[in-house]
Amino acid sequence: MVALDPRINPFRPEIAANHLRGHVEAKRFVEGSRHQIIDPVTAVRRTPSHDARLDTEALLGERMTIYETTDEGWAWGQLETDGYVGWLSSNALGAVGATPTHKVTVPRAFAFAGPDIKLPPAVALPMGARVAVTRQDERFAVTALGWHIPEVYLAPVKMRQSDFVAVAERFVGTPYLWGGKTSLGLDCS
């Protein structure tokens, strides 16, 4: 058998994704179930412990296939966006909802309960968080969750930034964080 990288292939000695049958050894193989990240950002760890190494972070709206859950509130699976495999709090997972249509394009964006920036923010979203926009309300995009986000902070999910240097410059001064994917801490990869 070819050695596969367990950071991007969902297998451990006790469990593996069904599509890896014949490629890895495991006590059992499972199909997995799709879920969606419902927290703005959540840690994806090497082992099911809050003290475990951070391998990456999952952002709001990302989809993840879950292969195992524990009674202690952990879930083990693989992110669809970058393929990373790891453990995260099962509280950060929800049912697959509306397909994200837009992503946050600034380092941080507030979402509000209504179309007014004077309202208390409902949540702060990191760059790359994905939301399903259902309509416009003045200068705000309204999401399937009922949040109002200033539309200037969003772009269609498939849109790519043409000037990656300008995007990187927005993060000058951001501290290094192994596995980090937000303006609170970034990994070099």
Feature locations, PLM:
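Boundary regions of SH3-family modules and the immediately adjacent low-complexity/disordered segments
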Residues: 1-33, 49, 62-65, 72, ...
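Hydrophobic/basic alpha-helical segments enriched in Actinobacteria
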Residues: 35-38, 53-54, 133
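Extended, low-hydrophobicity, Ser/Thr/Pro/Gly-biased non-transmembrane segments
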Residues: 37-40, 46-49, 68
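Short Pro/Gly-enriched beta-strand edge/turn motifs at strand-loop
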Residues: 44-48, 56-60
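Active-site nucleophilic cysteine motif
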Residues: 168, 182-189
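Second-shell loop/turn segments in exported
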Residues: 175-182
